[in-house]
């Protein structure tokens, strides 16, 4: 069991499974996964051993509520948003790398120097709501975001920024996010960059990726790298030359698979990536350019739009990495119709994935693996490779 004083003192119970031995956590998650697939014929599927995480220090991102006073800011959580007296400082949370604690100490000093009054939800007063810190494992560079109510403190922040950069030279991206609403909403739409660099470079398995301020990126780099590595190893076994990556984000799955396929089969690979976020598409396209992948087309569209496009060349492989709601019946039925040889399904919600697999009646699972992206909790991710059933 992790030695966590916050848990022991009942100050933070985010890690609901902290008292369960790690091996038992994996056993229970694997059992839960199999229960979600109980109605799917997995007799021919290869069940790989769960991909394990480090038990602590595995997170590359900290999301800290700011409370307290400008002289003595508290970075952590509010057990009761309407009562700032219940604030818990989580700067020593064992889920973060140990060096994050020293960074938080420097940021507390910066808050005072810049006069960033912590926002008080009950009184609806103050400026600084959250501090969001992300680290690149590949470069050890940092992205720092201040979530503020208004732009009022921007001149003071700019004035104090050189001193902050002296103390934290690894800061690559610094931005202000404006969230003016009096509500427990993490971030607003407007991002003001204080650095020339707007993306944080990361690298998994030799694939350059770029973390953007308002975008999704996995918070457990070791397990994320393992997830992408498994994906590329699984698909590289087959002669696949045309693939779609739906819900592609910054391109992690598609780029890993396209690079591996091109190296294995020695032919150009056509990759089409679909993602609703335009900034994610910019990041994915930049990665493809660095890799020298020429036949790549990342488009800022809703993944459901592929259903309407009847003229696209039919893919050999479709990768889906949907949000928790899954891909749904309509997209599942569309995949049954166009019948790619393979579907690679990555899910953060095995329950909705199980329902989707029931709709994918033309497919059978070949490989299944659990990835423990969120140790100390009941959550996990799963990767399934599906093959089109042969017609007798």
Curated annotation (Swiss-Prot):
Ligand binding (S-adenosyl-L-methionine): 218, 247, 275, 321
GO MF assignments: 4 iron, 4 sulfur cluster binding; iron ion binding; rRNA (uridine-C5-)-methyltransferase activity
Name of this chain's protein: 23S rRNA (uracil(747)-C(5))-methyltransferase RlmC
Higher taxonomy: Bacteria, Pseudomonadati, Pseudomonadota, Gammaproteobacteria, Pasteurellales
Protein's UniProt keywords contain Protein biosynthesis: no
Family per similarity comment: Belongs to the class I-like SAM-binding methyltransferase superfamily. RNA M5U methyltransferase family. RlmC subfamily.
Gene3D superfamilies, per database record: 2.40.50.1070, Vaccinia Virus protein VP39
Residues binding [4Fe-4S] cluster: 4, 12, 15, 93
Protein's gene: rlmC
């Amino acid at each position: 069991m992790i030695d966590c004083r916050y848990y022991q003192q009942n100050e933070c119970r985010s890690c609901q499974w902290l008292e369960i031995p790690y091996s038992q956590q994996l056993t229970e998650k694997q059992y839960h996964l199999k229960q979600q697939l109980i109605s799917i014929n997995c007799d021919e599927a290869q069940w790989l051993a769960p991909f394990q995480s480090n038990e602590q220090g595995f997170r590359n991102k900290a999301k800290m509520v700011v409370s307290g006073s400008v002289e003595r800011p508290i970075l952590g959580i509010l057990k009761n948003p309407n009562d700032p007296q219940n604030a818990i400082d989580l700067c020593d949370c064992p889920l973060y790398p140990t060096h994050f604690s020293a960074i938080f100490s420097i940021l507390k000093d910066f808050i005072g120097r810049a006069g960033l009054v912590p926002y008080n939800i009950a009184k609806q007063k103050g400026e600084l709501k959250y501090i969001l810190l992300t680290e690149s494992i590949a470069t050890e560079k940092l992205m720092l975001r201040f979530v503020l109510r208004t732009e009022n403190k921007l001149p003071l922040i700019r004035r104090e920024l050189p001193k902050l950069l002296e103390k934290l030279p690894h800061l690559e991206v610094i931005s202000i996010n404006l969230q003016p609403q009096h509500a427990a909403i993490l971030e607003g739409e407007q991002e003001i960059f204080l650095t020339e660099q707007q993306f944080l470079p990361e690298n998994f398995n030799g694939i350059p990726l770029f973390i953007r301020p308002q975008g999704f990126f996995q918070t457990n780099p070791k397990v994320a790298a393992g997830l992408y590595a498994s994906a590329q190893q699984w698909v590289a076994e087959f002669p696949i030359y045309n693939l779609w990556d739906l819900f592609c984000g910054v391109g992690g799955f598609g780029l890993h698979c396209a690079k591996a396929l091109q190296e294995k089969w020695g032919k150009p690979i056509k990759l089409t990536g679909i993602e609703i976020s335009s900034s994610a598409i910019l990041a994915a396209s930049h990665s493809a350019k660095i890799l020298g992948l020429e036949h790549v087309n990342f488009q800022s569209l809703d993944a459901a739009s592929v259903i309407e496009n009847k003229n696209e060349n039919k893919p050999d492989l479709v990768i889906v990495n949907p949000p928790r709601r899954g891909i749904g019946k309509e997209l599942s039925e569309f995949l049954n119709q166009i019948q790619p040889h393979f579907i690679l399904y990555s899910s953060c919600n095995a329950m909705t994935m199980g329902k989707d697999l029931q709709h994918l009646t033309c497919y059978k699972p070949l490989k299944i693996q659990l990835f423990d992206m969120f140790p100390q909790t009941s959550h996990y991710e799963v990767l399934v490779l599906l093959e089109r059933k042969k017609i007798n």
